């Protein structure tokens, strides 16, 4: 049994996001709902991203991960919110967690928004679907792999797979294999329950100030 440590290639993922956003904006334009993309929408979307990560955590929890082993954080200098799993979880469990936000506040809410003509909900759902690019790259990579255990260690843009098979023979979408070795050598940092980078704190404060100005000035 060996561990295989992967790091997300953020340049490739960001490029994919841009590619997905182009048809998204074309769709929004022809649907005639771009008028809803105002300041209030982006404030709501900011909190929608929190919900995205919360759903990842619910997926972990329903797959048997203890509440104390689910870590949340923000590292906006890398352009991400994240949810990390500090327990080893099987292939089925990580796939469930990856797909929770895509289906529940992406596909499902998109059709709900169309049925009730709630175009704010439609926009939030479309933006969330595009924001699932990293999750979907992991999903389509993982379904091709033989059985493994998944665990997060100390990098919000990376993860570790532990398997009896040689996973180095498999290419993962937008993921680089940076190391491998004996699972007993793995060391995990003692993360707090919630981790927020200094840049993210500053960003949150700016958002809060803008929100106060919008509502009270």
What are the roles of these predicted feature ranges?
Residues 188-202:
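Juxtamembrane/start-of-transmembrane alpha-helix segments at the extracytoplasmic/lumenal side
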Residues 75-93, 167-168, 173-189:
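Short membrane-interface loop/juxtamembrane segments of multi-pass integral membrane proteins
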Residues 1-31, 76-164:
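Metalloprotease/metallohydrolase-associated module, dominated by Zn2+-dependent proteases
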Residues 36, 40, 44, 66-79:
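A glycine-rich, hydrophobic loop/mini-helix early in the fold
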Residues 56-69, 145:
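Catalytic Zn2+-binding segment of zinc metalloproteases
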Residues 48-61, 101:
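Active-site recognition of the HExxH zinc-binding catalytic motif
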Residues 33-49, 90, 94:
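Short pre-active-site segment immediately N-terminal to the catalytic Zn-binding motif
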Residues 209-217:
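Juxtamembrane boundary at the C-terminal end of a transmembrane helix
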